[in-house]
From Swiss-Prot:
The gene is hrcA. InterPro entries: GAF-like_dom_sf, HrcA, HrcA_C, WH-like_DNA-bd_sf, WH_DNA-bd_sf, WHTH_transcript_rep_HrcA_IDD. One of its GO terms (molecular function) is DNA binding. This is Heat-inducible transcription repressor HrcA. Disulfide bonds: none annotated. It comes from Bacillus cereus (strain 03BB102). One of its GO terms (biological process) is negative regulation of DNA-templated transcription.
Length: 338
């Protein structure tokens, strides 16, 4: 159990180091208004905090820096909510104020804005396409044998693919098919489209389309689209601006991981509800052992739809990032309810 004096010194060391990226010595602490005790007392308390594992020495300075244990204690017990500037709140709310809420577009823009507001790397895992509902489908002929099928969902996701049009299917058949599909399938979840088409729509099409078998075969290929989440990054190179990562050898594996993107699918899937903070080696990926990852989920009711996360150095502005993520996830959740 830390004393009140030790708590104050630990919080002051971490706050100062987060802001300056410089090791903190007793002389620096003695100049702080909140620290009213002698330099000797400060040194003794710092020695105790170091022995307890909350701070540690660096090779290049006589000052101390927070350890992972120190950051964890800080996040769990010392962190105070930070009020965001009014202009930032307005900027974020404006993003979600559009009359037509397109989740894909919002997810992409959220990653960009968060990276700009924090100068860290922002990652947004969008909703699974399987949870989207079909808004409409278009089939646009390119020539006699090919066409582009354009599928639009209620979240604004647009999926297009080139399909082969059988010789036996004419343009009037295509037009009839599209009209029937939009009439019968609008509002149906993407994950249910295949069953809906082959249990109900095929019966309807039989009465309207000539060359029925060829049309159904083409239709089957049209709706074979990936239903997994999309991941969006903002500020992929922002880590290079952090003093901790000026050594390119140290940051190379992290940048490779960010650039490949795939590992973040597993990291961000199945997150617990609410704000989660992973510090240093608490992260499963070795490339992230000098980083902190703060994530938050957004959902509708009990259904978790996606994750918003910020990746930065362990010397991260935890309070500010958490406040930003809370605002973003709240706005995202409200937008999805529109």
């Amino acid at each position: 159990m830390l004393t009140e004096r030790q708590l104050l010194i630990l919080q002051t060391i971490i706050d100062d180091f987060i802001g300056s990226a410089q090791p903190v010595g007793s002389r620096t602490l003695a100049k702080k208004d909140a620290i009213t005790f002698s330099s000797a007392t400060i040194r003794n308390e710092m020695a105790d905090l170091e022995e307890l594992g909350f701070i540690e020495k660096t090779h290049s300075s006589s000052g101390r820096v927070p350890s992972e244990k120190g950051y964890r204690f800080y996040v769990d017990h010392l962190l105070a909510p930070q009020n965001l500037p009014k202009d930032e709140i307005v900027q974020i709310k404006d993003l979600f104020a559009e009359r037509i809420f397109e989740a894909e577009k919002i997810a992409q823009q959220s990653a960009q804005i968060l990276s700009e507001l924090t100068n860290y790397t922002a990652i947004v895992l969008g909703p699974k396409l399987s949870t989207n509902k079909l808004k409409n489908v278009q089939i646009v002929p390119l020539d006699r044998q090919t066409a582009v099928a354009i599928i639009v969902t209620d979240t604004g996701h647009v999926q297009s693919k080139t399909i082969t049009v059988p010789e036996s299917v004419d343009l009037s058949d295509l037009e009839k098919m599209v009209n029937i599909l939009n009439e019968k399938l609008s509002g149906v979840p993407m994950s249910e489209l295949h069953n809906k088409i082959f249990k109900e729509i095929v019966t309807v099409l039989r009465g309207y389309v000539h060359n029925y078998d060829s049309a159904i075969k083409m239709l089957d290929g049209t709706f074979q689209v990936p239903l997994s989440e999309k991941i969006y990054f903002g500020g992929k190179a922002n880590m290079l601006s952090q003093p901790e990562f000026h050594d390119i050898h140290k940051v190379r594996s992290l940048l490779t991981m960010i650039d490949n993107e795939a590992e973040f699918y597993d990291i961000l899937r199945h997150k617990q509800v609410g704000i989660q903070v992973k510090i240093g080696r608490e992260n499963s990926a070795t490339a992230m052992e000098d980083c902190s990852l703060i994530s938050a989920t957004y959902s509708i009711g009990e259904e978790q739809l996606g994750t918003i996360a910020i990746l930065g150095p362990t010397r991260m502005q935890y309070s500010r990032v958490i406040s930003l993520l809370q605002l973003f996830t709240r706005q995202f959740t409200d937008g999805l309810k529109k």
